[in-house]
Amino acid sequence: MNILSIETSCDETSVAITQDGKKVLSNIVFSQIKDHQMFGGVVPEIASRKHVELITLILEKAFQKACLTPQEIDLVAVTQGPGLVGSLLVGINAANVFAYTYQKPLLGINHLLGHLYAAQIEHQIKPNALILLVSGGHTELLHFKNHDQIEVLGTTLDDALGEVYDKIAKALHLGYPGGPLIDQLAQTGKDTYHLVRPYLKNNNFNFSFSGLKSHLVNLLLKQNIQDLNIPNICASFQASVIDVLLTKTKRVLKKLPIQQLIVTGGVASNSALRKKMKETFLDLEVIFPSVQYCTDQAAMIGIAAFYQKNITPPSYKYDLTALPNLTF
């Protein structure tokens, strides 16, 4: 089965063609980072306009790379949410038009589900897996029982981890996006600031990083940037958030018979997180998608669609709309 998938939930314009829920025939991604850097973050209006400019070209490139024609597509899948409503609508409108033109079935996919299935591209997700999803907009612990039964164990109560990375980087005048910059600087620093480990004095699996963000931003505002050891601040920040992720994950493992741990989402490309997770959970099969599949891209949407098509039947109505606040 050949699946055409489209992802435009934020600031990446991506189109992919995948085969049988495993093989990636093409996965074209255009990142808008340079368009948003001067603003220190994603500007929704700019993002949606850029998607409009690029979507047709990216579609053409995906077919060229896959060496297929539109007639050879069996299913069209598109990110329906969550995300920026203007950005989502560009991808959804493109999917509606393509599917209608070639009379192909159409399926809307949850972006978060896509991140989960990013691991399926190079690995095999097993029943009763624990999923730690860490991205720009979400921090979630999920129990993957099987393809039609995914339970949310813990979620973000305020700021998602990727968002906090960007705000700390902005306070340090490092630039955007903040995640890779902080990760790189932290490699030469030490945990000398011993920052708070937020929201651990409880028995649940939820996350809250707003207190840590406020504490660190206030610390930076009270001191001259030139007097600070930036690598040590980055290392201390990473040590704090990784400790929280490890502690919450351990808490789940004490209650559920998990044999496989999958860490996915944009923050899963962080080198320190990848290293600590693999060092800590030696008795588990710990899986990270390749860095190219951690960030937003359409291949993960196509893989998710292959497994979800029998759970949520595709439609020939071609009237999908955006669901910007979609959850699991």
Curated annotation (Swiss-Prot):
Top-tier EC class: transferase
EC number annotated for this UniProt entry: 2.3.1.234
Binding site for substrate: 133-137, 166, 179, 183, 270
Catalytic activity: L-threonylcarbamoyladenylate + adenosine(37) in tRNA = N(6)-L-threonylcarbamoyladenosine(37) in tRNA + AMP + H(+)
Cellular component terms (Gene Ontology): cytoplasm
GO MF terms, alphabetically ordered: iron ion binding; N(6)-L-threonylcarbamoyladenine synthase activity
Keyword Transferase found: yes
InterPro entries assigned to the protein according to its UniProt record, in alphabetical order: ATPase_NBD, Gcp-like_dom, KAE1/TsaD, TsaD
Keyword entries, A-Z: Acyltransferase, Cytoplasm, Iron, Metal-binding, Transferase, tRNA processing
Top-level division of the source organism's lineage: Bacteria
Co-factor: note: Binds 1 Fe(2+) ion per subunit.
Family statement drawn from the similarity comment of this UniProt entry: Belongs to the KAE1 / TsaD family.
Name listed for the protein in its UniProt record: tRNA N6-adenosine threonylcarbamoyltransferase
Source organism per UniProt: Phytoplasma australiense
Gene name as annotated: tsaD
